[in-house]
Amino acid sequence: ANINLHAFELAESGHPMTFFGKSDIIIGGMDLGIHALLSTLYWGGFLVGRAISSFFSKISAKTQLTVTTLLATILAIISMLTQNLWYLVAIGLLHSTMWSCIFSLAIKGLGKYTSKASGVFISAVFGGAVFTLIQGGLADIFGSWRWTWCLTVICELLMLSYALFGSRIRPKDIIQ
């Protein structure tokens, strides 16, 4: 949703988004606009990523999470600097594989407590709503969405640090 609001802001400032050179999309006489397309492609990328992530099962979750968070961080920074929202749309593809990696790393070695930990972990999805609200507040404070994506970069870097350091399991951490 925040990608759409940023697209509206760019259009109003005289920098409309285009898709194959068109700044509007008319289907069945209805102007769907680029804004709807951005969201559709983000979630479409998410779906495609989930579908192809099974092919990466031979690659460790730690490696997958490291690579995807690094790429997502780079894309978010490029998007902020260039004001090109297509880079943010591409992050949807990367985010799709992150969820399963984080989940796998979080429950590894929990033994009989895996189901309880899974429930706690699933409830943490609420954080996505909280960070969206924080980003909206930052957009109000800054008067623009452009630099609010720093919050996304910070979150990506936190996930990167989890992949590199926080997901390590020491023998004494394993619960029997």
Each predicted region: which residue ranges?
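Short hydrophobic/small-residue motifs within alpha-helical transmembrane segments
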Residues: 40-47, 125-127
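Helix-to-loop junctions at the C-terminal end of transmembrane segments
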Residues: 48-61, 139-140
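Helical-face signature of the major facilitator-like transporter fold
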Residues: 84-96
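Extracytoplasmic gate region of multi-pass secondary transporters
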Residues: 1-39
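Intracellular juxtamembrane helix-capping segments at the cytosolic ends
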Residues: 96-114
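A membrane-interface helix-boundary motif in multi-pass transporters
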Residues: 134-156
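Multi-pass alpha-helical transporter architecture, strongest
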Residues: 150-176
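Structural signature of the two symmetry-related core transmembrane helices
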Residues: 63-78
